[in-house]
């Protein structure tokens, strides 16, 4: 996956605005802020250390599980789908491909995402993205969604 994220611009949306777009709620709302910049979505999530997914993963050395990295990317990408969804429609994960975990994420880290929709053939959407901490890529991959309902 070779794409570069553009510099931030556009309007920042915080959690309450994100809740108007995504159906996720705590503890599964995993974006603190997001920007739509052209064809890209840029998101952030601050790992506080008290999240449910850190309990037992791993005692004394907590790390954010890889599946949570993927969920954060998915939520960021789904912000891009929001304009085209009708009432009651829900994008669901259809697949993950070429996912690579490159750097661990720990409590106190701020995850920054960059995602874009590569291709769309309704009801399927194909995206790619990456998440970084302090400029280091933690995860990258391609993922797809199927829009259901409505």
Language model: regions and residue ranges:
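Hydrophobic core residues within well-ordered beta-strands of beta-rich domains
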Residues: 28-30, 111, 125
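Catalytic strand-loop segment that frames the active site of acyl-thioester-processing enzymes
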Residues: 26-64
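Extracellular/lumenal ectodomain signal focusing on beta-strand-rich modules
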Residues: 32-33, 98, 128, 142
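Hydrophobic beta-strand-centered segment that forms part of the acyl-chain substrate-binding groove
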Residues: 76-112, 142-146
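Short, Lys/Arg-enriched N-terminal segments with co-localized hydrophobic residues
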Residues: 3-12
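Active-site helix/loop of acyl-thioester processing domains in fatty-acid/polyketide metabolism
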Residues: 34, 64-87
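HotDog/MaoC-like acyl-thioester-processing domains
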Residues: 38-39, 105-109, 116-150
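Short aromatic-glycine motifs in intrinsically disordered, low-complexity regions
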Residues: 13-25, 86
């Amino acid at each position: 996956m070779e794409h570069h994220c553009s510099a931030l611009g556009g309007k920042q949306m915080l959690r309450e605005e994100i809740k108007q777009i995504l159906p996720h709620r705590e503890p599964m709302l995993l974006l603190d802020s997001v920007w739509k910049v052209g064809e890209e979505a840029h998101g952030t999530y601050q790992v506080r250390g008290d999240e449910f997914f850190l309990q037992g993963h791993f005692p004394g050395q907590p790390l954010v599980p890889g599946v949570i990295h993927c969920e954060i990317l998915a939520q960021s990408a789904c912000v891009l789908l929001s304009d085209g969804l009708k009432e009651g429609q829900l994008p669901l994960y259809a697949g993950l491909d070429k996912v690579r975990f490159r750097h661990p994420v720990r409590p106190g880290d701020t995850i920054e995402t960059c995602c874009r929709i590569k291709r769309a053939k309704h009801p399927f959407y194909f995206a790619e993205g990456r998440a970084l901490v302090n400029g280091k890529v933690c995860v990258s991959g391609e993922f797809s969604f199927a829009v259901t309902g409505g």
